[in-house]
Swiss-Prot record:
Top-level taxonomy: Bacteria, Bacillati, Cyanobacteriota, Cyanophyceae, Nostocales
Localisation: Cellular thylakoid membrane
Protein topology in the membrane: Multi-pass membrane protein
HAMAP family in the cross-refs: PSI_PsaL
Protein name: Photosystem I reaction center subunit XI
Family: Belongs to the PsaL family.
Record NCBIfam families: PRK00704.1-4
InterPro entries in alphabetical order: PSI_PsaL, PSI_PsaL_sf, PSI_suXI
Entry keyword set: Membrane, Photosynthesis, Photosystem I, Thylakoid, Transmembrane, Transmembrane helix
Intrachain disulfide bonds: none
Primary location: membrane
Length: 173
């Protein structure tokens, strides 16, 4: 058994002996690695289509999309897993909690924007970081749009959850 293992370690044709992790762009000075995950076309496509990295959209729209998604999904855990989960006011408590967290997150984004953040670094997965994240003004625009989108996303989730029976009756469910 040990002899077979030693034989496979020394065989260049064995696929387990192939290198799969390389320095980014084959330059070890960059300090990033290309792995089969972060350099695959599927992952690059997925990350490139996220609102933060999608080319051709404004800073305000980036913040609005990210805020709407966060407001929408933050509502659920507060409403359905919070301490008031089995009460009549569970959805309202979830909405208010989600709004509070969105406001805290917006404050954190604003603080970051005012701290003179460094310019984004080009990486394997994001070879072209957007211009929006290269200035304090861009980050402030992103933060204000995040607040609007976050509030909107949480309110939409609240109305959908609170009126679930009505929505189901409209669609025959």
């Amino acid at each position: 058994m040990a002899q077979a293992i030693d034989a496979s370690k020394n065989s260049p044709s064995d696929p387990r002996n192939r290198e799969v992790v390389f320095p980014a762009y084959r330059d070890p000075q960059i300090g990033d690695l290309e792995t089969p995950i972060n350099s695959s076309p599927l992952v690059k496509w997925f990350i490139g289509n996220l609102p933060a990295y999608r080319p051709g959209i404004t800073t305000f729209r980036r913040g609005l999309e990210v805020g709407m998604a966060h407001g929408y999904w933050i509502f659920g855990p507060f409403a359905k897993l919070g301490p008031l989960r089995n009460t009549v006011n569970a959805n309202l408590a979830g909405l208010l909690s989600a709004l509070g967290l969105i406001i805290i997150l917006t404050g954190a984004l604003t603080l970051y924007a005012n701290s003179k953040p460094p310019k984004p670094v080009k990486s394997v997965a994001t070879p072209n970081p957007p211009e929006a994240f290269q200035s304090s003004e861009g980050w402030n625009n992103f933060a204000s749009a995040f607040l609007i989108g976050g509030i909107g996303g949480a309110v939409v989730a609240y109305f959908l959850t609170s009126n679930l029976e009505l929505i189901q009756s409209l669609f025959g469910g």
